[in-house]
Amino acid sequence: IHQFIRKAELKFKVKNVVNSTYDIETTTLKMGGFVTYTNLSSSISKVSHTAVSSDSTLETTEYVVSNSITVRVPNTKLDTTLMLISRNIEFLDYRIISADDVALKILANTLTQKRAKMGMSRINQNNNGNSAVDIITNLQSRADDAMIANLALSDQIQYSTIQLSIYQRESLKRELIANNQNIK
């Protein structure tokens, strides 16, 4: 039986990053998922000043708003979530979807746990003193590591990860500011 870890990565242009971010977050929640990361920022590309009078200057700022978002949704809702997110796309840079079958990794971890338990019971039967304690501790540590690895894989199977990089067209902000150099 296959057990897939499904992931999606998208980069696209939107009309308004802030509005699209809220839409993506709302869609994620409605699908039973959650946001694990978001980094909404504005990057200034140019600032210019134009004198409009002896005491006033027009400051023009050119900037780009972008956001990197990571969400997790139930595996069964990945396709629906991607379709709902796509309504925000003005231009798609790329979309990558991957599915990694981890059934053999889970089997290997389960077998490691069984071997460790069998080894511990054999050592307990022979009761070899202090060296047995070290061996049992080592075996238990291996079993614990395998169990934790399976839990992590199970979580990744149940919840797909979607990484989004969104941006919008460059924006302008104009502001009339005081020209302090000419004020006496």
Predicted regions and their residues:
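Extended, helix-rich structural scaffolds rather than catalytic motifs
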Residues: 170-184
